[in-house]
Structure formats: C-alpha cells, structure tokens
C-alpha cells in the first residue's frame, strides 16, 4: 500500500548537522546507489540492531497502524517548501545524493530507486546517547510497551548526536511544535501561518510528542510517556516563537490538537548527566505561541478526558523554568489543587537508568525534586499528584460545612418514612392548624410572610408527655398533600422568616436535598412552639420536572402540608421519632380563587345507615357542586365511591348542605375512615376531608334534666321535655334489637329498625334520661301487656339468664353474643304478648306486684324513629323541679367490657343492678324501662 510521503528537495537545511555531514561521519551503513528502503516490518523488528540508524519516526498513515497513533490522513497532500527558503539556523547542506538518507539493501523490482526524495521519519531519541558518533540504546524504551502494541517503524532519516543537535546560541527548535524541529523550510512556513485544522486527523503534519489520543487504557499512561520529560525541559527559547508559550491567560484559551510542549526535542541524558549544550535555564518562557497550541475553555473543558495526560505534561514543560522548583510552581493557579497540604509521599516506581542496570531502584517515597534527570516511569500518574483536572468547571469551591445542629445520625429515619404521632406517653400534636391557603413566594420575589392560622395568629405545635429538662429540636419541612404516602414535596420548600415580629428562633438545614427548619422545643415553654418563622418557597417547575425519575407536574401539585417531626431520646439509648402533619394548604393563588374549599363541616362521624344532613362551610361553592364520598385502600386506590345528595335550594357560595350517603357495608364492627371532596368540574376539586362511619345497632341514651328544655329526635312526645346533661354516666356501648319483633309492648305498631352506635366521647356517649315519677302516677297494670317491675330487695342481684331476645337487648351479630343483658322480672296473664320461650325465662311462678309509682325509677329508651306513637299520655305534666343528688355512692353497675376496637367480649358478663335509695334520682336503663311500660299499661287502661 502506498504511504504518504513528504518530498523534500536535495538541499535540506539541517543547521549544525551540516558540519557533521561535511566531515563524512556517517550514522549508519552507507546506502548503495539506487537502493530501496526497508519495509516497515523489517525496520520495526530490526530497530535495536547497531547497524540500523535509529532516529525519530514520523508515523504515516499505514494500513496496519491505528489511526489514533498517527492521526494523518492519506488524502492530505504533502507540503513542498521552496528550495530557496533561507535556513537561518545553520549552514545549508550543499549536496549529497538522495540515497544517502535511505536504508540500503533493497531495490524495487524494476530496479528503480525507492524514492526520488528522502522520506523524513522522526522518532524519539530518548534512551540514546552518543558514543563514538553512533547511536546505541542504553535502555530499551520500547520495553515500556508490549510488543503487540508497538508502532512499527519505517524508513528513517539519521540525525546527528545530541551535542550537535542544536547550538545554544541559536533559536530553540523546541519552541515550535512543527514536526520538522530543525527550523526547516516547512517548519518556518508552518510557524508563520496558522492552518484551520481542527483535529490531528486533518492536520498535514505530525507532532513529535505523544498524541493526546495515544493513551493506552490498560496501562493508564500514554504510550510515549517514556519519551516525554516530566521534570521540565532544561531550557526555554530565549527568543520569540509564534505562540509557543502557554500562559495563565492562554491556559484556558483555544485547545489545540497538539500538546503545548515539544517534549521530545530536549532531553536529559539517561545516565543522570545534564547535557553540556544547556548549562543554564531560560529566565522566561516564550511570550508567543505557535499554531494550534493555545488551550481554550471550550476545548479544554470539552476534551478533558481525552487530553488529560498530555495536556498536563505539556503544561508542565511549557511553564517550568527551573527543574529544582516544585512542579506546582509552573502550573496555572486555576489548574492547581485547591488543597494546600502536600501528600506525605509520592508512590512512584522509578528506576535510574545508567550503565549499571542491576542497581537497586530508589525508595518509592523519594521526592521528585531530588532528581535532576528524567527517571523511567513504569506505572502511575506522576502529574496527577499535582494536578486535579476537574470533570466539571464549577467544582472548585469547597462544600459548605454542616453545622453541629444539623448533624443527623444515620440511624434516624428518613424524611419519607411514615411515623406515628404518639407513642407511649409522648404525643406530638398540632394545637392550632394552619390556614387552608397560603400564597407561596417564588425565588425571584420577596417573602410572602409566615404561614398563618385560620383563626388568626400562627400554627402551634406541642409535645405532650415529655417531662425531662432537656430541650428538643422540632423539625419542620414541607410535605405532600396528595393521595399517596406523605413525603417531602418536590416543588415547595420551607422558607425561614426573620424579622422584628418573629418570636421563634429557627435554623435552616439540608437533609437529603430537602430544606428543614429546626425549631427548639423548650421545657420552660411546656414543649410548645409558635410557628411564626416558617414560610413556603416555590421552586421552579422546570428545574424539578427535568430531574431524573421525577414524574410529578408542578402546576398540578400545589397543595402541601406542614410536617413536624421530633426525636425523643430514650433512657435505653434509642431515639423515639414522632411526626404529625397539618391539614392541606393550597399554595397557588389561582387555585385558591377557583377551587372549592371546605373549611368546616357540621359533623365528622355518623352511623353507616346515613341519611343525616351535613352542612359544609367554605368558599367557591356552586349550584352544581357535587360531593363525592370515597373509601381508599392503603395503596391509594378507590375501594368505594358514592355521590351524596346536595340541597341546591340551600346552596350558597360559602355553604353547602349535603345528605350523608349510606356506607357500602352495613355490618361493620369498628369505625371506618373515609374521605369526601367537593367537585365543581373536571379539574376543580377541593381537598379531601375526613369522615368516619360508625357501626350500627347501638341506641343513643342520654341523661337530660327537665328544666333544661332542648328537643331531641326521640320516640314520641316524651322526648320534648328532655335535654342532655353535660356529663355521661357510662361510656359502654349498649345494644338494641335489630328487628321490630323484639318490642315487648303489645298494642302498638313495631318500631322500625334503628341502628346506631355512640362512641365513648362526652359529647356523643350514651346518657340516662332524668324523668319525674309524677307523670306515671295513674298507671294500672293491663292484662293485655307485659308488666315489668323491680321487686327484688336492696342488695340482691339475681343472675340473668341468656335468652334469645331479652328486653331491650339483641345478639348484635350472628357470631357475637349480646353485650348487655338486663335483669327483669315479668308478671303477666296468659294473654300476654310475650313469646313462650321468653315468658318462661322472664316470668317467675309467683308474680310480684308492681312498686308504687312514686318509688319507681323511670327510664326512657331513645326511640327508633319519630314515626313511633306516643309512649306516654301526658308529658306536659312533668314537674318543673326535680331532686338531683349525683352522689358517687349510688352503687355499682357492672356492664360488659368493651375493647377499644368496638368489639365486646365473646362471653356475656352478668349485669348486677343495685336498687337505689328513694332519695336518689340516679336512674338506670332497667328502671326506666319498667316505668315506661307501667305508664303505657295505665294509659291503655284509662282509655
């Protein structure tokens, strides 16, 4: 394959080399006239022999050579400089046959000479020294690379010895990066003109130094690193060479396709002696640069990984003026390491190369400045110990140290963990909730102030149950308010508010790329903090949406929560972490003006039967607004969804009346939490509001004085004179028959089914009715009705039999026994309406006469529905004054134990009822039932 060659005229100026050639000293065997050059393979394998002149090879575009090693296109034409170009370096060589520069021993098959002009191939002269005008290898430089990776040598041009290489008084050929290096005509022509070659592949000339792309990835250093000096060139050019120097200003200039140092043109001898031609160092580097030498920001930063090794070597050679100085002195300030401490030792495998190859190598931690000559480096990156080339141009600044208060132990839970709000005696509670709307401020505008509370002021958070004297740190961050699990919000961050009106101190910290506001909880303030120092900052949507793995959209995710977290140390050494989140906060001004907003609801729980009216207070309600009840699974999916009926006639912009829909499961045994929202359109929904469905089949029993009139939804006119007392008398759950057939009062239509459950709360717990016995003084037993009474003496507590359907009780559910059984004694004629089985268990053989009405203790059951007929004839005759003695010594009353989950014990517990003295008006359910039935009997008799 024909290779690209550079035709050179016979008068080739070689400067001082002319003297050597003139004396007839040859550097190799005399070539025969018309001889041909050796092939590349033969020259490569015979490189170390003494009869072949080693020289500086200029790699050509050979088919067997990798392109990155040569970077020369075969299509690039050779540059033929004019023959009359002035030399300027030394005497011109007048004559000499072309074959003088060629290797001998071969001719073309047709007998023609191999080349009309010599082909110049320049190779490294490192490892060669002058001995009787012959070049010999003191150390095989090629041993650095494996034989399979060596570049095959081609025909070479013999050059003189190192002493005759240059004249110290003349211009430095090394200041130019041209491949002619001896101030040839082409070199001068190249130095004066710049060529638009963007890369080494398009350049017609080759650099003698190691190409930046010749780095061997397996060995970690360039192939020709042994041919490059690392301790700097011994002397710089005293004169000007066009753009040969690399200053601090041009260090980040345009990046060249060639390194910034000649590297191979001036060397120390390998035996440790400094060559005599350069006894002193040039005080300053060349003020100008040669073509394609300057390094710019664009090319340097864009090609950092390609040119790291060669660019570092080039920079050191170009900027080092004294070999005894530290290598860092010649490195630009912008390229040095930011740290000032020197590494304790530079682990280098260096071996002095001299006549005695068996001498032991120096210690590995030998300082590099103690060597005045170049050392043979087998492994490691010497320059990397002094230069840290960054992969990004903006990583020079040191990271900001974390404050001691922001240090978090790795054992503390992450911000996206779901933590409880109470554990044991500790409870973290938001005493005052924040306002449902807060205008978050952008990064480009000023603060919008701290988050405020709905009733004025600011949110308040308190830790209950903490009795120690050590303060704790309350953490606050902005969390999500969507259907998914609580986590830090991607588009909003907490913002620290300061000013004269801010009374709470705070500190900002960064935890897992989330800004956290730390607020102290002080024991002298009862572990209570007023959150008047927290605002909300809106981040730029594009910055967050372009993150890897981010799927949320900023404009659709404008609701947040204030998430508070505290870590309580335990005596065992562990840390208890509590977390509580506020109500959702709308941060978008547009959303606050268009989306419906629910601020208050009249009720937050109701039995599963539904049907009650609920009033919603808020903003942006319309006539066509819909209220949707939904039940969500733990993973966020909707299990149940139901649209509630709204009263359009009563709808106002700030209020909405809705009927609670029945729940999907009417037989729940524990409260079920659901949510509802108001919808004005497809994308105009309010925030989710919580609602609780309660189990059915439990009556509502209240204790009401007669002088405090308040209507209640009770059965018949009896309830018109009743009102609830402020204090409940028992908190257990009682049961009522689920079907109308369990009503034991004959002559009246059965009550429709009414299933309710009252939780153990003071506001809604079952209470007793306080009725006067005067309303029942005209009662006479009727043969056609069941007559109930309490004849047992004081202190007697008869055992209660387990009957299928006792009075005012029910079995609850098929697998659940009756939670309460009331002791009753029934006396009735055979015409009684009691069932046979129930009559046998409740009616004893000896009937007992009823007690006088004045001594009876009446009670009243909460009715099933307002449609029931009146239970008494004259409720208006109730006395206006009733004796009340709330003595706690009224006597024990045992009821079945009810667990927190709402399910009673599996086995029924006997109920013990003690008769109260006559002066006490504390009535119980069984007493009231007896009085009611007696009164009903008397009313029927008189009618």
From Swiss-Prot:
Region feature (Transactivation domain A (TAD-A)): 126-218
Disordered as annotated region, ranges: 22-48, 200-298, 787-912
Nuclear localization signal (motif): residue ranges: 265-267, 682-684
Start and end residues of each stretch annotated as Transactivation domain B (TAD-B): 703-943
Motif (Nuclear export signal): 310-321, 924-933
Stated induction or repression of this protein's expression: Only isoforms A are inducibly expressed in T lymphocytes upon activation of the T-cell receptor (TCR) complex. Induced after co-addition of phorbol 12-myristate 13-acetate (PMA) and ionomycin. Also induced after co-addition of 12-O-tetradecanoylphorbol-13-acetate (TPA) and ionomycin. Weakly induced with PMA, ionomycin and cyclosporin A.
Residues with the Phosphoserine modification: 233, 237, 245, 269, 294
SUPFAM superfamilies: E set domains, p53-like transcription factors
Annotated tissue distribution: Expressed in thymus, peripheral leukocytes as T-cells and spleen. Isoforms A are preferentially expressed in effector T-cells (thymus and peripheral leukocytes) whereas isoforms B and isoforms C are preferentially expressed in naive T-cells (spleen). Isoforms B are expressed in naive T-cells after first antigen exposure and isoforms A are expressed in effector T-cells after second antigen exposure. Isoforms IA are widely expressed but not detected in liver nor pancreas, neural expression is strongest in corpus callosum.
Keywords associated with the record: Activator, Cytoplasm, DNA-binding, Nucleus, Phosphoprotein, Repeat, Repressor, Transcription, Transcription regulation
Pfam families reported in the protein's UniProt record: RHD_dimer, RHD_DNA_bind
Subunit relationships: Member of the multicomponent NFATC transcription complex that consists of at least two components, a pre-existing cytoplasmic component NFATC2 and an inducible nuclear component NFATC1. Other members such as NFATC4, NFATC3 or members of the activating protein-1 family, MAF, GATA4 and Cbp/p300 can also bind the complex. NFATC proteins bind to DNA as monomers. Interacts with HOMER2 and HOMER3; this interaction may compete with calcineurin/PPP3CA-binding and hence prevent NFATC1 dephosphorylation and activation. Interacts with TLE6/GRG6.
Domain notes: Rel Similarity Domain (RSD) allows DNA-binding and cooperative interactions with AP1 factors. The N-terminal transactivation domain (TAD-A) binds to and is activated by Cbp/p300. The dephosphorylated form contains two unmasked nuclear localization signals (NLS), which allow translocation of the protein to the nucleus.
The name this protein goes by in its record: Nuclear factor of activated T-cells, cytoplasmic 1
Lineage: Eukaryota, Metazoa, Chordata, Craniata, Vertebrata
């Amino acid at each position: 394959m024909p290779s690209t060659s550079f035709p050179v005229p016979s008068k080739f100026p070689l400067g001082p080399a002319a003297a050597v050639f003139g004396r007839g000293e040859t550097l190799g065997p005399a070539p025969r006239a018309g001889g041909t050059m050796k092939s590349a393979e033969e020259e490569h394998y015979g490189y170390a022999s003494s009869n072949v002149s080693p020289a500086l090879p200029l790699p050509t575009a050979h088919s067997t050579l990798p392109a990155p090693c040569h970077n020369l296109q075969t299509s690039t034409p050779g540059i033929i400089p004019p023959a009359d170009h002035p030399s300027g370096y030394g005497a011109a060589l007048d004559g000499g046959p072309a074959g003088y520069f060629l290797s001998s021993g071969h001719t073309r098959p047709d007998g023609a000479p191999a080349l009309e002009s010599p082909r110049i191939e320049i190779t490294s002269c490192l490892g060669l020294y002058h001995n009787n005008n012959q070049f010999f290898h003191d150390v095989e430089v090629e041993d650095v690379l494996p034989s399979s990776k060596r570049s095959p040598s081609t025909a070479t041009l013999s050059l003189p010895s190192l002493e005759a290489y240059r004249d110290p008084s003349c211009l430095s050929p090394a200041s130019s990066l041209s491949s002619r290096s001896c101030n040839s005509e082409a070199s001068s022509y190249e130095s004066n003109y710049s060529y638009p070659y963007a890369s080494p592949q398009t350049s017609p000339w080759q650099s003698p130094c190691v190409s930046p792309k010749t780095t061997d990835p397996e060995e970690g250093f360039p192939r020709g690193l042994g041919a490059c000096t690392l301790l700097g060139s011994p002397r710089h050019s005293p004169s000007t060479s066009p753009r040969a120097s690399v200053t601090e200003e041009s260090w980040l200039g345009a990046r060249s396709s060639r390194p910034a140092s000649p590297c191979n043109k001036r060397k120390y001898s390998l035996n440790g002696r400094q060559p005599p031609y350069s006894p002193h160092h040039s005080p300053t580097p060349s003020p100008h640069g040669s073509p394609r030498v300057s390094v710019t920001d664009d090319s340097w930063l864009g090609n950092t990984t390609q040119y790291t090794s060669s660019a570092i070597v080039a920079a050191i050679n170009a900027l080092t003026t004294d070999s005894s100085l530290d290598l860092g002195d010649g490195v630009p300030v912008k390229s040095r390491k930011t740290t000032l401490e020197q590494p304790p030792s530079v682990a280098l495998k260096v071996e002095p190369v001299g006549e005695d190859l068996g001498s032991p190598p120096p210690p590995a931690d030998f300082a590099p400045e103690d060597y005045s000559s170049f050392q043979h480096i087998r492994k490691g990156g010497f320059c990397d110990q002094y230069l840290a080339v960054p992969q990004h141009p903006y990583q020079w600044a040191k990271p900001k140290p974390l404050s001691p208060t922001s240090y978090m132990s790795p054992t503390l839970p992450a911000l996206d963990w779901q933590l409880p709000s109470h554990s044991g005696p500790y409870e973290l509670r938001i005493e005052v909730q924040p306002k449902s709307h807060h205008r978050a401020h952008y990064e480009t505008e000023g603060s919008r102030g701290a988050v405020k509370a709905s009733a004025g002021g600011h949110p308040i958070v308190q830790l209950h149950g903490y009795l120690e004297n050590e303060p704790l740190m309350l953490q606050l961050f902005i969390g999500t308010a969507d259907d998914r699990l609580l986590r830090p919000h991607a588009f909003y961050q907490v913002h620290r508010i300061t000013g004269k009106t801010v009374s709470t101190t705070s500190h900002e910290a960064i935890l897992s790329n989330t800004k956290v506001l730390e607020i102290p909880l002080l024991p002298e303030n009862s572990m209570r903090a007023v959150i008047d120092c927290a605002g909300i900052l809106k981040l730029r949507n594009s910055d967050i949406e372009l993150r890897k793995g981010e799927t949320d959209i900023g404009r659709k995710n404008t609701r947040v929560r204030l998430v508070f977290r505290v870590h309580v140390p335990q005596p065992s050494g562990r840390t208890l972490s509590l977390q509580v989140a506020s109500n959702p906060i709308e941060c978008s001004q547009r959303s606050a003006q268009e989306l419906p907003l629910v601020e208050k609801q009249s009720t937050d729980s109701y039995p599963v039967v539904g049907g009650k009216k609920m009033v919603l207070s808020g903003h942006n309600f319309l006539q066509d607004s819909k209220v949707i009840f939904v039940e969500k699974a733990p993973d966020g999916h909707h299990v149940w969804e139901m649209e509630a009926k709204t009263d359009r006639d009563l709808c106002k912009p700030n209020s909405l009346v809705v009927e609670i829909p029945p729940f999907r499961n009417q037989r729940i045994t524990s409260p079920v939490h659901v949510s509802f929202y108001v919808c004005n359109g497809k994308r105009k929904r309010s925030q989710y509001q919580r609602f609780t469905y309660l189990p059915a089949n439990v009556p509502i029993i209240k204790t009401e004085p007669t002088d405090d009139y308040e209507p209640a939804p009770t059965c018949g006119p009896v309830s018109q004179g009743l009102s609830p007392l402020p204090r409940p008398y028992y908190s257990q759950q009682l049961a009522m028959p689920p079907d109308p057939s369990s009503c034991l009062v004959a002559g009246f239509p059965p009550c429709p089914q009414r299933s309710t459950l009252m939780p153990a709360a003071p506001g809604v717990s079952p209470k007793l009715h306080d009725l006067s016995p005067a309303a029942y003084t005209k009662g006479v037993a009727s043969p056609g009705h069941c007559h109930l009474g309490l004849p047992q003496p004081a202190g007697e507590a008869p055992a209660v039999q387990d009957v299928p359907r006792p009075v005012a009780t029910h079995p609850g559910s098929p697998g659940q026994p009756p939670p309460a059984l009331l002791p009753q004694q029934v006396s009735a004629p055979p015409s009684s309406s009691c069932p046979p089985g129930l009559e046998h268990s409740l009616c004893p053989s000896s009937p007992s006469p009823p007690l006088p009405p004045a001594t009876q203790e009446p009670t009243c059951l909460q009715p099933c529905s307002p449609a029931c007929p009146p239970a008494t004839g004259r409720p208006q005759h109730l006395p206006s004054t009733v004796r009340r003695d709330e003595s706690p010594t009224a006597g024990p009353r045992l009821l079945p134990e009810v667990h927190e989950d709402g399910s009673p014990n599996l086995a029924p517990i006997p109920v013990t009822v003690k008769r109260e003295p006559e002066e006490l008006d504390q009535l119980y359910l069984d007493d009231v039932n007896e009085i009611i039935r007696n009164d009903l009997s008397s009313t029927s008799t008189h009618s």
